[in-house]
């Protein structure tokens, strides 16, 4: 099966065939750096990180460009409120964004351009549009004329007449048509500005991405991504600007990730259900958040809640428990001359899932099946003496680490990760690690004295707090849930 992707432009899955064999150019709209990133930003960036990783995994040479929007109305407003420059504010939140993405385990894009470093490219692109007669200057502002681009709204499939009837011209704007949008904004007091043929000013939001994407990927490239909220107006306007200037198809495949709801409601500051990545990572491990995002198909809406994150933590713990158990057993089983195709089989079904429009939910399901097989085999009587089964577990273990790496998962030492999770969960019970060890000693003493009622009482008391005691040949261990 070859890779198929869902193209927003056509509304269907298509076989992925890049413009240049073996090479992929991918542009993803980055954040506007005026505040800390929220869970919606986490989803978009994790999704396209996985797409980037998987394309590389299957052999493509990928140039991945993800920008910073570092000049914008929101940045200017926030900077003025704080009494600092836009540059200072943008720099602060670029650093914060990078820290958040590093914690989430994102691979670094090939290029991370800033809009303010591409003013010359933006000005040149605006001039090309004026020269082609589809943009016009008005009192220092420059607008794109949507009526002169007949295929406008082809991405969002909106109706021009309906859009026009609902559009309004903001006081001070000198548009010919309410639907026209700004390419260049004349300078205003208290705003950053750059020189241009139309006087000092700054770029509009949409033109920034057109200029940066074409600068690094060419006038036509393979993949443009972002959240569904960017389809209109941002991506629609990018198409109009770019194709209006070049006369060429701008992007071959448009990919958009779904929304994040919070407790089945739209995330909104006004509803009080707005969570930054930093808020979430105070309670949950970054890999848990990443795992949660990947358990849904990227185009589907995803519901963020404490319960769903707890479920994700439990699911990821099961992977690490299986990997930890397998590593301990395999360490006592020297490699033999028997091989197994189990790893290759797992990779095949994993790739089938990912080739179906990057279906991470199905891919993770196949990895879960592998962990269940490992857990079953290593607990079978006589396992260590069965060379075929040892080889099967070794092959599955190696494949899990390899394929998990494609998803940015299972990157920690299993024993260390499980201990960290145990201690984090224990902290919510009011007990300390030494408290649990003391309970275990008391229980051992009770059992030694045949006071089984007291031993059961201790076990049940801990279980009520979400702490499970695990009796084994090496003694009693504990696990917090």
From Swiss-Prot:
Catalytic reaction list:
tRNA(Cys) + L-cysteine + ATP = L-cysteinyl-tRNA(Cys) + AMP + diphosphate
**Residues reported to bind ATP:** 269
Q: Name one GO molecular function term.
A: cysteine-tRNA ligase activity
At which positions is Zn(2+) bound?
29, 209, 234, 238
Task: Quote the record's cofactor note.
Answer: Binds 1 zinc ion per subunit.
What positions does the record give for the motif labelled 'HIGH' region? 31-41
- A GO cellular component entry from the record: cytosol
Tell me the subunit arrangement: Monomer.
**Entry's PANTHER family?**
CYSTEINE--TRNA LIGASE, CYTOPLASMIC, CYSTEINYL-TRNA SYNTHETASE
Q: What name does the UniProt record give this protein?
A: Cysteine--tRNA ligase
Native organism is Syntrophotalea carbinolica (strain DSM 2380 / NBRC 103641 / GraBd1)
Origin organism lineage: Bacteria, Pseudomonadati, Thermodesulfobacteriota, Desulfuromonadia, Desulfuromonadales
